[in-house]
Amino acid sequence: MALSWRSWLANEGVKHLCLLVWLSLNVLLFWKTFLLYNQGPEYYYIHQMLGLGLCLSRASASVLNLNCSLILLPMCRTVLAYLRGSQKVPSRRTRRLLDKSKTLHITCGITICIFSGVHVAAHLVNALNFSVNYSEHFLALNAARYQNEDPRKLLFTTVPGLTGVCMVVVLFLMVTASTYAIRVSNYDIFWYTHNLFFVFYMLLLLHVSGGLLKYQTNLDTHPPGCISLNRTPSQNMSIADYVSEHFHGSLPGGFSKLEDHYQKTLVKICLEEPKFQAHFPQTWIWISGPLCLYCAERLYRCIRSNKPVTIISVINHPSDVMELRMIKENFKARPGQYIILHCPSVSALENHPFTLTMCPTETKATFGVHFKVVGDWTERFRDLLLPPSSQDSEILPFIQSRNYPKLYIDGPFGSPFEESLNYEVSLCVAGGIGVTPFASILNTLLDDWKPYKLRRLYFIWVCRDIQSFQWFADLLYVLHNKFWQENRPDFVNIQLYLSQTDGIQKIIGEKYHTLNSRLFIGRPRWKLLFDEIAKCNRGKTVGVFCCGPSSISKTLHNLSNRNNSYGTKFEYNKESFS
């Protein structure tokens, strides 16, 4: 199938427009700052001393200021959840844009790493030029104490140098601990190192307070390149001759452009010596707003989550899947949202996000999550919830004499799956444990489907073995029977795909016989599936939601952008559980 521009604009248009705006801001800031320090008269003397390193260091710093402010905004989860649920964002396309917050965070992080490298390299050159081009006439301009001072002293004995080295170390730890391998194998390392961001920002505010780079303040009485009245220059002294007496060693900036500007005229006579002053730090202007917003949100979340939940029951499902049912006063959530669990007995500072598989309603206050035991945190959490003698039991009711650990929740927070009920037709695709975000959607339909726009749901679940399916089969079985009894058999189209066949007839045939016709061996034929959905829903907009491996996600994403002969538009949404 050929690319559909209609579908592509729906899925990618706003995202690429925002990317273009962000990229334009970065380029504009970099170029404007570069030209300012390269051609600005107030930076003439410092530019002659440092050359290109000055321009690159300041231009990269402006890009860092922008991205260090933007990177915090996607982490304001409560604000994003409020915007998604409020009437102030009525457009579904705008709400879908909020789901790209993680992408913006990662993009800004990569940009910070790249331009930090440029910034560090430029300042290494600056340190060398400060030492080599030491000026005896403009002492206030020097960062070095004498000519040919060891540049390493500038890096490790000055506030900007020392804080810069510390920031590079902190940034290196945060970046290396953010890799997929570390997040999966040892989430603790990722969590603790990422919380070093506060140290990074404090160092950043100290870094810009050093005032090593200075600009000229008295341009009216001392035009750049002039000579003062207390000197008697030779009649034909040029600007290059004059400045060469003030700066020892090579001049990295050169004077060809300056000679052209003055048309090789004699140096002007000035009224006083140049005066230099350090810039007032501007970084705090960039980051103070987002940083205060983030800190205020964290404070609000801390207050909101300071009361522990009451654990109603713990269910140990096959395939190392745990179900946790809880209750908390005044807790409200929408289908598709997620919460963050914090168990001090497992880790004092570590938190983990889990999608709600059961939301509270007007008639019941119970809510729950499912999680797969993978990684050190979930293993320790499982051991606290289940006593050793009950590891293989199915359910531990609340009335049992069991002392559960204290558990705190933060949230709820928004996710793309909130939109699944706002389409007339939705296609939900899950891979393995990625089925959990859809559990709350199905539970909501089981309670009452009439208030929502959704009238047809295609539910596709790809599992490795039958035990992965077993813990979710009860909900699918009840939901399937509900719509058959209400004479709406086409409301939910369930398709289950398993790659292993051992024991299928024994387990499925006895308890969930009505799902036998929905069970398939192998993998879905995605292109045929999309063609069938497009044919049955001509001219409609279908919401595509995926939570699973990247291979499935990429396939669905590509098919959503493809053209079809039925006028059906597919809008792609994705949630990552990695």
From Swiss-Prot:
Catalytic function, reaction form: NADPH + 2 O2 = 2 superoxide + NADP(+) + H(+); NADPH + O2 + H(+) = H2O2 + NADP(+)
Listed EC numbers: 1.6.3.1
Glycosylation sites: N133
Highest taxon listed in the record's lineage: Eukaryota
Tissue: Expressed in vascular smooth muscle.
Induction: Up-regulated in diabetic kidney (at protein level).
GO MF: heme binding; modified amino acid binding; NAD(P)H oxidase H2O2-forming activity; NADPH oxidase H202-forming activity; oxidoreductase activity, acting on NAD(P)H, oxygen as acceptor; protein tyrosine kinase binding; superoxide-generating NAD(P)H oxidase activity; superoxide-generating NADPH oxidase activity
Function: NADPH oxidase that catalyzes predominantly the reduction of oxygen to H2O2. Can also catalyze to a smaller extent, the reduction of oxygen to superoxide. May function as an oxygen sensor regulating the KCNK3/TASK-1 potassium channel and HIF1A activity. May regulate insulin signaling cascade. May play a role in apoptosis, bone resorption and lipolysaccharide-mediated activation of NFKB. May produce superoxide in the nucleus and play a role in regulating gene expression upon cell stimulation.
Region (E-loop): 218-273
Cofactor(s) the protein requires to work: heme
Keyword field: Cell junction, Cell membrane, Cytoplasm, Disulfide bond, Endoplasmic reticulum, Glycoprotein, Membrane, NADP, Nucleus, Oxidoreductase, Transmembrane, Transmembrane helix
Membrane-side (Extracellular) residue stretches: 38-62, 126-154, 210-424
Gene Ontology BP terms: bone resorption; cardiac muscle cell differentiation; cell morphogenesis; cellular response to cAMP; cellular response to gamma radiation; cellular response to glucose stimulus; cellular response to interleukin-1; cellular response to mercury ion
InterPro entries xrefs: Cyt_b245_heavy_chain, FAD-bd_8, FAD-bd_FR_type, Fe3_Rdtase_TM_dom, Fe_red_NAD-bd_6, FNR_nucleotide-bd, RBOH/FRE, Riboflavin_synthase-like_b-brl
Gene that encodes the chain: Nox4
Cytoplasmic side: 1-16, 84-104, 176-188, 446-578
Membrane-spanning residues: 17-37, 63-83, 105-125, 155-175, 189-209, 425-445
Protein name: NADPH oxidase 4
Membrane-related topology note: Multi-pass membrane protein
Activity regulation note: Activated by insulin. Inhibited by diphenylene iodonium. Inhibited by plumbagin. Activated by phorbol 12-myristate 13-acetate (PMA).
Record-linked Pfam families: FAD_binding_8, Ferric_reduct, NAD_binding_6
